[in-house]
Design a protein with these regions (language model features):
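A translation/RNA-centric and nucleic-acid-associated enzymatic feature enriched
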Residues: 148
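A hydrophobic, small-residue-rich beta->alpha segment in the mid-to-C-terminal subdomain
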Residues: 168-198
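Short, conserved charged micro-motifs
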Residues: 101-104, 161, 174, 198
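N-terminal lobe of the biotin/lipoate ligase/transferase fold
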Residues: 1-144, 154
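Short, acidic Gly/Pro/Ser/Thr-rich loop/turn segments
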Residues: 54-55, 157, 172-173
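Conserved phosphate/anionic-ligand binding catalytic regions in large, soluble enzymes, centered on
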Residues: 158-171
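Residue-level recognition of well-ordered beta-strand positions that form the cores
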Residues: 94, 151, 164-166
């Protein structure tokens, strides 16, 4: 893991080049959150990818522990079920929300706009959908398709977990589930949209 220390921001930017096991990531975040809450460690933003897994949020109910031998992890984040794996960029935040007036809605709003602006740089028109969390765009068939997901949790005044952006991942894993609990939904990736001109 590479640490890019931005002293003036008081935030550590962590970059992992290898796939990070989900158990390790959760353990790391929970320890870091505890230290941030105590003022021992700086806030952090972590860029990584996971091996192929499914994760479920607090509002998802299932007794299964795998889907086609891909493990399912029950998490404490918001949301339902989604897939993570190679080709999907994960960005985990460990941010003291107390310093930001405990405004979680504003934090989510800023994250969503950040993703939309980044995709716009790639000439991908992305947008939010009413009453749904995440970022959407049109897939190659003109369907509304999710390209980025968000799931957050707060502990001791520190927000953690984060967002995922589909860059060049296999979309077949999403077809085995109702992504984020939305039936008959479509999922896409940056590569899927741009492959004809890349």
């Amino acid at each position: 893991m590479k640490i890019i220390n931005k002293k003036h921001l008081q935030i550590d930017f962590l970059v992992s080049k290898n796939l990070v096991p989900y158990d390790y990531a959760i353990n790391f975040m929970e320890h870091r959150v505890n230290y941030i809450a105590k003022g021992i460690e700086k806030e952090a933003i972590w860029f990584l990818e996971h091996p192929s897994i499914y994760t479920t949020g607090r509002s998802f109910e299932s007794k299964a522990d795998n889907i086609d031998n891909i493990p399912i992890y029950n998490t404490g984040r918001g949301g339902k079920i989604t897939w993570h794996g190679p080709g999907q960029r994960i960005i985990y935040f460990m941010i003291n929300i107390k310093k930001r007036n405990n405004n979680i809605r504003q934090f989510v709003f800023n994250l969503e706009n950040y993703i939309i602006n980044c995709l716009e740089e790639l000439d991908i028109i992305a947008y939010k959908k009413k009453n749904l969390i995440g970022i959407w765009t049109k897939d190659t068939n003109g369907n509304d398709a999710k390209i980025a997901s968000l799931g957050l949790r707060v502990s001791k005044g520190v927000i953690y977990h984060g967002l995922s952006i589909n860059i060049n991942c296999s979309l077949s894993y999403f077809r085995k589930i109702d992504p984020c609990g939305i039936k008959n939904s479509h999922v896409t990736s940056i590569f899927e949209i741009k492959k004809n001109i890349m």
